[in-house]
């Protein structure tokens, strides 16, 4: 069974619960993906830094309780754990980052594990914002490819955290160029390709990288994949959303769980089935508040697919 390493930020999400209260929820896209993968029965390890503080210990204990490997999760005594206030309006979300730079931005090469052949590394763009995390992330990508593994990238753009839009595009596109698997939202893809329509953005990215598995998520409508000149829309199941915070991360968890356990994932019938399950994982995650708490188990996913 191939292991999935997830590199990046582990975040404490503060989610409104009534007028004067916030729920403290474990979050951060990479941490969510690691937990999501583990709940689906696949081996997962987290690579990243949190503060040596109550919130950092809370994150480490949370991941450990979910059977995610935390040997590469460093408690940094000099930095603070990333904390985000999540705003919800009709189920859609907004983010206010309370700690910048946070501990995750201080990841060092010495924090990286020894990668093995056929393992997967997944990351998001927050890991690329500042040094030393940026250089460490690119070194992790180099090492996993050298070991005979795969790199998956979900930009998950947070423009407000970057010094400039130009720097964000330049650095994120460097990671895009190195990925075997890419997951974009429509807005992210048009921004990164300097286009204004999904059609133009898709044409640009597939012409540049025909050999990569490129997936564009379309919310309740499912996802479109492109690979080696082939493309297909894989429809999703619509559910009434309570909170969309973890939907993208749940999709990625389902996707990685499927890809990592299949040696012939580039075959159309296999890929369609993997993406169908990823769509279902994303849909299920919208039915509860909080990103991590809503991630489905393997049993929940199988039951939903059977309905």
Give residue ranges: language-model regions:
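Glycine-rich phosphate/adenosyl-contacting loop at the front of the ribokinase-like
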Residues: 1-69
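Conserved phosphate-binding/catalytic region of the ribokinase-like
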Residues: 1-3, 142, 198-307
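Active-site metal-binding loops of divalent metal-dependent hydrolases
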Residues: 10, 126, 155, 250
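Short beta-strand scaffold segments in enzyme catalytic cores
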Residues: 35, 83-87, 222-226
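Short, conserved phosphate/pyrophosphate- and ester-handling motifs at nucleotide-, phospho-/glycolipid
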Residues: 37, 185, 248
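Conserved N-terminal subdomain of the carbohydrate kinase-like
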Residues: 43-123, 303-307
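Active-site beta-loop-alpha junctions enriched in small/polar residues
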Residues: 100, 126, 156-160, 187, ...
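Conserved phosphate/ATP/ADP-binding segment of small-molecule kinases
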Residues: 147, 161-233
């Amino acid at each position: 069974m191939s292991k999935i390493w997830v590199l990046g930020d582990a975040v404490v999400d503060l989610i409104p619960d009534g007028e004067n209260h916030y729920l403290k929820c474990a979050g951060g896209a990479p941490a969510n993906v690691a937990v999501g993968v583990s709940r689906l029965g696949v081996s997962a390890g987290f690579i990243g830094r949190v503060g040596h503080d109550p919130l950092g210990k809370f994150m480490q204990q949370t991941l450990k309780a979910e059977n995610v490997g935390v040997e590469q999760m460093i408690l940094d005594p000099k930095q603070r754990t990333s904390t985000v206030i999540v705003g919800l309006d009709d189920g859609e979300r907004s983010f206010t980052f309370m700690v910048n730079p946070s501990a995750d931005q201080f990841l060092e090469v010495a924090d990286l594990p020894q990668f093995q052949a056929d393992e997967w590394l997944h990351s998001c763009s927050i890991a690329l914002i500042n040094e030393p995390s940026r250089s460490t992330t690119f070194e992790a990508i180099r090492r996993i490819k050298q070991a005979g593994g795969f790199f998956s990238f979900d930009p998950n753009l947070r423009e407000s955290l970057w010094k400039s839009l130009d720097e964000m595009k330049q650095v994120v596109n460097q990671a895009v160029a190195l990925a075997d698997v890419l997951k974009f939202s429509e807005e992210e893809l048009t921004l990164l390709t300097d286009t204004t329509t999904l059609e133009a953005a898709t044409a640009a990215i597939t012409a540049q990288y025909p050999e990569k598995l490129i997936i564009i998520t379309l919310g309740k409508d499912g996802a479109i994949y492109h690979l080696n000149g082939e493309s297909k829309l894989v429809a999703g199941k619509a559910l009434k959303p309570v909170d969309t915070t973890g939907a993208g991360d749940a999709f990625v968890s389902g996707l990685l769980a499927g890809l990592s356990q299949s040696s012939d994932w580039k075959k159309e019938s296999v890929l369609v089935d993997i993406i169908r399950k990823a769509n279902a994982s994303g849909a299920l995650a919208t039915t509860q508040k909080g990103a991590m708490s809503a991630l489905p188990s393997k049993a929940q996913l199988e039951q939903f697919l059977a309905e």
